[in-house]
């Protein structure tokens, strides 16, 4: 059934690692609000959130992974999704699952020119269960692009409606529908 994650994962509460995109998901972003509701969750830290360099961001993600006591669920937004795809090809640390929200197209006109090294986007399957979530009016990446990434990565796919870039500007608050998708990803 389209929209329903089909991967199985281990039961029980696990760690989560928030992987923001450019700008580090500010105070009104659902990633930040989720993290505030779950004090045990952690966030990747990057040296420069406004001028991302993929090679540097890879090391930031890997350093955060090294500090965790168990395989986490990765909760990525925008450029964080591209980072997860690159990291999955570069590193071998275990991951429970990944929620990949609003995948941007690096060849699109809205992709930040300050971002370096995110192209080409890996087209190999991820080695962990994953779900790509897209919006039908995301200015940074079309549904068709997100669907292609999901197919390349072996990810399940959900089109979440007309909710922009699925960020604070979308007015989602703590995005309850996203939490439902995360819970379904982890339970199936």
Residue ranges with predicted function:
Residues 24-25, 136-141:
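Acidic catalytic loop of the alpha/beta-hydrolase fold
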Residues 40-42, 151-167:
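Catalytic histidine neighborhood in serine/cysteine hydrolases
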